[in-house]
Amino acid sequence: MNNILIYIGAAVILLALLATAAEVQRELHSFKVTHYHVTSRKLSGLNRPLTILFLSDLHNWRYGEKNERLLRAIENEHPDLILIGGDMLVGKEGTPYDTALDLIRRLPALCPVYYANGNHEQRMKEETEIYGDTYNIYKRKLEDSGVIFLENDARRIRMGQTGISINGLELPCSVYTKFQ
């Protein structure tokens, strides 16, 4: 009888571990589109609703071959602007950035794209003794495709009769510390 209880307990634990592993895999291979509706009197000069798409923290992840699933989802939103909040790549020595580059290069064909660095891009930018000129090459390739980088910078654009300020704040690596 005790052996049966041990086997049942082990089976329950094994099933729980398998279910957890399956959920982790599902989370890693899916993304969620969330819609927010913002209203403000300051936006009254818009002649139609504005769709702003925000991307961040993809960390070189690929959704389908050449990110086709993600790109289709972006296209289906018909964005007026795309804002990138950084960490599109992995800032670790020897880690290629091709996945992020290939996706982001395709976005300016849809609408204007504004990019602010996250801690991974910032690490590559600051730590040239490790990364060499990798950040500058990555940035130049994206700028050549039409991406606008905002590094402690702002751009003022007009949408309808409304002026909109898009700002990018660049934080030094020293700010990105783990909480203890």
Task: Give residue spans per PLM region.
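N-terminal membrane-anchoring alpha-helices
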Residues: M1-L43
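Residue-level signal for beta-strand positions within conserved beta-sheet cores that form or flank
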Residues: T34, R48, T162
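Membrane-embedded segments
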Residues: L46, L50-I148
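Short beta-strand-to-loop junctions in surface cap/lid or active-site-entrance loops
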Residues: T39-S44, A73-E75, N167
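His/acidic metal-ligating clusters that form di-metal
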Residues: E75-D80, R106-P112, D144-I148, D153-Q180
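Residues at the C-termini of beta-strands that transition into short coil/loop
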Residues: K42, S56, N117, D153, ...
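A short, structured loop/turn motif at beta-sheet edges
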Residues: R41-N47, M159-G160
